């Protein structure tokens, strides 16, 4: 979420306010309908790769022994790494054997993954090109998930709203309100549950 938000700011030429960040890092996969552009014989153990970073991230292991969709650092409860995908009718985790990883299916995630773009994440060591949701879809998705968050995640929910408002303000200030409005209409046209949650945000 936050890293995508920051990368969207880079793409749009905007520096966001400080209060819009969380320490979650999310990796999203669009589900079974999209192939990852990797060689067919490539095997990567995500757990080993994360362990090599020496950040203290431990997997929340599933019952089947696979590294779970979430990693946490016991010393820093704010730092969390999530591997997510769209929720299907089966509501089961998507297991990626070549990565030794299970992805957590999330409601409404498909909205962000339907139209993606590329952006850049910068660090002291350089830059990296990443795939991102279209900014308008990212913002509308944040409004939708606001309605899904439990009271225990109210601080995170408020950051969802701040991120959505920041992006919506960008579109309004730059004469592109129609771009945001098209994404909004798409979301609320998907049914009562979508509309109710979006309007809560």
What are these regions (language model features)?
Residues 2-201:
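Compositionally biased terminal segments of proteins
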């Amino acid at each position: 979420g936050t890293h995508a938000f920051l990368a969207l700011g880079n793409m749009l030429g905007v520096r966001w306010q400080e209060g819009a960040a969380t320490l979650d890092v999310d990796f999203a996969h669009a589900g079974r309908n999209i192939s990852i552009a990797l060689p067919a014989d490539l095997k990567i153990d995500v757990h080993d790769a994360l362990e090599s970073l020496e950040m203290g991230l431990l997997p929340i292991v599933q019952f089947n022994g696979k590294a779970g969709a979430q990693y946490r650092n016991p010393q820093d409860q704010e730092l969390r790494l999530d591997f997510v995908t769209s929720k299907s009718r089966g509501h089961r985790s998507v297991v990626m054997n070549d990565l030794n990883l299970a992805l957590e299916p999330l409601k409404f995630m498909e909205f962000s993954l339907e139209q993606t773009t590329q952006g850049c994440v910068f660090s002291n060591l350089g830059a990296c090109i990443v795939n991102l949701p279209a900014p308008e879809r990212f913002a509308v998705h944040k409004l939708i998930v606001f309605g899904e968050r439990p009271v225990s995640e109210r601080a995170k929910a408020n950051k969802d709203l701040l991120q959505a408002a920041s992006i919506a303000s960008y579109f309004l200030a730059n004469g592109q309100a129609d771009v945001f409005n098209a994404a909004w209409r798409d979301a609320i046209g998907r049914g009562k549950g979508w509309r109710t949650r979006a309007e809560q945000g």
